[in-house]
Amino acid sequence: MRIFSFLFLLLLGILTGQGLVSGTDNGKTTDVTWDKYSLSVKGQRLFVFSGEFHYQRLPVPELWLDVFQKLRANGFNAISVYFFWSFHSASEGEFDFENGAHDIQRLFDYAKEAGLYVIARAGPYCNAETSAGGFALWAANGQMGNERTSDEAYYEKWRPWILEVGKIIAKNQITNGGPVILNQHENELVETTYDPNHTLVVYMKQIAQVFEEAGIVVPSSHNEKGMRGVSWSTDYHNVGGAVNIYGLDSYPGGLSCTNPNSGFNLVRTYHQWFQNYSFTQPSYLPEFEGGWFQPWGGSFYDTCATELSPEFPDVYYKNNIGSRVTLHSIYMTYGGTNWGHSAAPVVYTSYDYAAPLRETREIRDKLKQTKLIGLFTRVSKDLLKTYMEGNGTGYTSDSSIYTWSLRNPDTNAGFYVLAHSTSSTRDVTTFTLNVTTSAGAISIPDIELNGRQSKIIVTDYNFGTNSTLLFSSAEVLTYANLDVNVLVFYLNVGQKGTFVFKDEPKLAFQTYGNSNLTTSESSYGTQYSYTQGKGVTAVKFSNGVLAYFLDKESAWNFFAPPTTSSPQVAPNEHILVQGPYLVRGASVNHGTVEITGDNANTTSIEVYTGNSQVKKIKWNGKTIETRKTAYGSLIGTAPGAEDVKIQLPSLDSWKAQDTLPEIQPDYDDSKWTVCNKTTSVNAIAPLSLPVLYSGDYGYHAGTKVYRGRFDGRNVTGANVTVQNGAAAGWAAWVNGQYAGGSAGSPNLAATSAVLTFNSSSLKDQDNVLTVVTDYTGHDQNSVRPKGTQNPRGILGATLIGGGNFTSWRIQGNAGGEKNIDPVRGPMNEGGLYGERMGWHLPGYKVPKSASKSSPLDGVSGAEGRFYTTTFKLKLDKDLDVPIGLQLGAPEGTKAVVQVFMNGYQFGHYLPHTGPQSLFPFPPGVINNRGENTLAISMWALTDAGAKLDKVELVAYGKYRSGFDFNQDWGYLQPGWKDRSQYA
C-alpha cells in the first residue's frame, strides 16, 4: 500500500509538473473538471474565451466555417450556441436536423475543424430576441400550460425536443471526440424560492434528467439573469436543480447610439458575487456584452459608435480578467440576421448587435482589439490559477487609477489590471505602479492610460524555458516558444514601455524598426525602456530572445495561427504573422510556410516560424516573393483587392402582380381555414367570438389574411383589434374598398381601429371584410401578460350599427405547419398571396399577364404588389464581397415591404418606422457567380399608396480571400413548384 501510495504521488507530481491538474468532476466524466480557479479539459487548465454564435441566423452552413476561422484567428477557443426549437420543429413530433442549416452535425464538425470548443445551449427556452424565445411556434399558443415550470402539459411538449437535440449534442461531446465541453440547462431562469418541491426546482431537475437520458455527460451550466437573484448554484441554497458550473450574465455598458458620453461604467463587484455564491467553481460569464440589440424605430447598428468602439473590449474585458473570470463568453460575437420571421418583436431584420464581427462577416476594429485579449489569455497559463491579492486605488501614484492585483500561488506570477477609477473618463493619466515581485517591491514608472484604455501589467511572467519577465509596463500580446523564445508587446504610439528580464545580466541587442531601446541599471536587473514608434520594431537579444514592439494598429493586424487543430494551443504550437487583414491558418511544408487569409488592401506580411529551413511563403496557394530578415523572419507582400472594380447590375427590369387579390369581394376563399372555434387553448380570452387567434388555426409566422362576412346595409363600421407584435401594422377593406387600419407602433404589440364603412359599398347579404396583418414575431417570456403565449392575429372584431359576423376564414403561410419548404424552414414565409404561390422562389416563371412595373412605381392606393426580377453576378472566384440591397422611400410612406433573395426573406422594411433600409445577403443566399432571383412584396397601409425611391445593389467591402466562396449553393435554393392549392 505504501509503495502504491508513493508511486501514485510520484505520478501525480509528474502530471502536475506537465500542467495536468485534477479537480471536481460531475461523476459522469473526468474529461472536463473544475475547481475554484478554472475549467480543465483533458487535465489541462483552460481559459475559456468564447463567442456567441447562432447558426440559425446564418442559413449557409459553409459560412459557419468562415465565421469559426475568423473567431479562431482572433483569439477565441470556443463558441457558445443556442439551438432554437422553433427552427427545427414546424409541427408537433416533427424535427428536422438534416435539411440545409438545420443540419447541426455540420456545426459541430466545422467547430472541431476550426479548433473551437462548443458550449451547447438548447433551452428548451432561449430568449435571444428570437420569436417566442426559441419555443416551437406551434406550441406557443397556450397549449404548454404554465411554461418554464414543472407543469405536465409543458413537460410533454419540451421533452421530445431536448431528447432529440440532446442525442446529437451527446454524440459530439469531448468524451466522444467532439467539441462539446459544457451543456447549459434552460436560460436565465431566476430561482425564486429555495424549496425542493417548488415548481422551478422540479423543472430544473426534469431538464437534468432528460439531458441525462439523451446521453449528456459533460458538466452542466446555467446563466444567471444579472445580479437579480441567485439561482442553481451548488454553493448557495442547493435544494435541487443546481448545475455544475454557475454563470452570471452581464450587460453593463449602458451605452447610447445617440449620446457618446453616456454609460461606460464598469461593474467591479463580479469577484465578490462569485465569492459569495459560487466559491468552489471558476468564475463564469456565459453572456457578457459584445454589443446590444436595437428595436424597431431605434438606431441602426452601423451608427452606434460607442458600442462599436474598440475601447469597450479593451476596458470591459480586461476588467473581467481582473475580477478573476476564467470562463468568458461574449454575446454576441457574430449576430447575423433575423431572416424570415425568426425575430422577436423587440428587434428588426438585422441582428448585427454591434458585435465584433459584423453581420456581413467583416472584421471590425472591436474584434481586432478583442483578439489582443484572446491571444494573451491563450498563452498566459499562470492566469488560470490566481487569487485576489487586492484591488482599489492605492496601487499607483495617482488615485484616479483603479487596480486589480492577481497572484498565482504556485509561480508567484502577478497580473495587475489597470483602468481609470472613473471608467468613462477620457483623461490621459501618467503614473507609477507599485508591484510585488520575486525581487521585492518595485515601482514601475511612466505608465500611461489614454482615457478609455486598460492595461494588464505582468510580473514574474514566464514565457519559455529560462525566460521570465520580472515585470513589463508594455502589454504582452502573446509569446511563442520556437527556435528561440519570441515575445510580443504592444502599446499606443508615443506610450512608454519598460521591462526587465528576471535573473539575466545586461544583454546586448540589435534593434530593427522605429522604437529605440535604451537601458538603465537597477538593483533588480537591467531595465529596457522604449517609446513606442509607429509600426513594428523587432529587437534581437543576446540571450536569444526575440521581441516585437507593436503599435496598436500593427497589433490589430498581428496573428498567431496555430499549427494544431486543438482549441488548446501551447506556445510552441503557433507561428507569428503580421500584416494582413486576416490569417485563417498556417502550416509548414517542405521549406515553405503556407498561409491562408484575406486582405482588403495589399499589405506587407512578416512571418516568424522558428524554422531555418523555411525559405518561402505561400499566400493562398501562391508563392510570393520573399526576403529573410536579420532576425530570422520572412517578409513578403500579400495581395489585396483594392484594384478590383465591383460592377453590380442595375435593377431596372421588373414584373409586378397583385399580391392582395383577397381584397376583392368575389375572391374564392372556399378552401381557406374556417375560423369556428368558440374557445381557445390560450389562457387569454378573445375580445369577441369566434376565436381569431392565428395560432389556433395552425398559422404562426408572417402575414395573415382574414375574411369575415356579414349581412346588411345598416352596418356603419367595425371595431377591430390586432396583435402581431411591436410595429406590426394592418389594413382592412370592405367589399374591395379601403376601410382603415393601423400603421403600427414600435411601442405597441396590439393596435385598435374603428373602421368606417361606406354604405354605398355594402350589400344586403354577404359583405366581406378583408383584414391583412403584418407580423413582427411572437413575444418572449418576459412580456406581459403571458409572454410567448400572447396571441397573434385578430383579438377581437365587432360590427358597429347592428348585427354580427356570419363567418370568418383565415389564410397564412402555404401549408401552415406542413413545412413544405424544409430547407428554408417554417419561419421563412408568410401568407401574402405571392408568397403562398411561390413567386419569390428561383425558377418561377412570371406569366405574360404580369405588368412591367417596378417598386419605384409602387401603388397609388391601398393595394399590394409583388415585384420580381433576376440578375447575374460574376465576381472573381477568390473574392469575398458582401452584397446588400439598399431601399428608400419618400417621406411619409406607410407600407410593409419584404425582400426575398433566391427564396429567402432577408428584409422586412417598414419605411415609416425604421431604422433599417440596407439589407445584406450572405453568399449562399445570393449567388456571387450565377443567376439570382430577387422579389419585393409591398402593400400600402393607407389609401395614400406607397412606392420606393431607391432599390439598388450595393457592395460593402471587398477582400481577396483564401476561403472558398465559389461553391454550388443549389441545395440551399430549392426552386418553384406549383402551389395553386394554397390560393
UniProtKB/Swiss-Prot annotation:
Organism domain of life: Eukaryota
Gene Ontology molecular functions: beta-galactosidase activity
Active site: 188, 287
Annotated residues for binding of substrate: 82, 127-129, 187, 251, 353
Sites where a glycan is attached: 197, 276, 391, 434, 466, 516, 601, 676, 714, 719, 758, 804
One Pfam family here: BetaGal_dom2
Primary localization: secreted
Family matches, as SMART domains: BetaGal_dom2
GO cellular component: extracellular region; vacuole
Swiss-Prot/TrEMBL catalytic activity: Hydrolysis of terminal non-reducing beta-D-galactose residues in beta-D-galactosides
A GO BP annotation: polysaccharide catabolic process
Subcellular location: Secreted
Name of the protein in question: Probable beta-galactosidase C
Organism whose genome encodes this protein: Aspergillus fumigatus (strain ATCC MYA-4609 / CBS 101355 / FGSC A1100 / Af293) (Neosartorya fumigata)
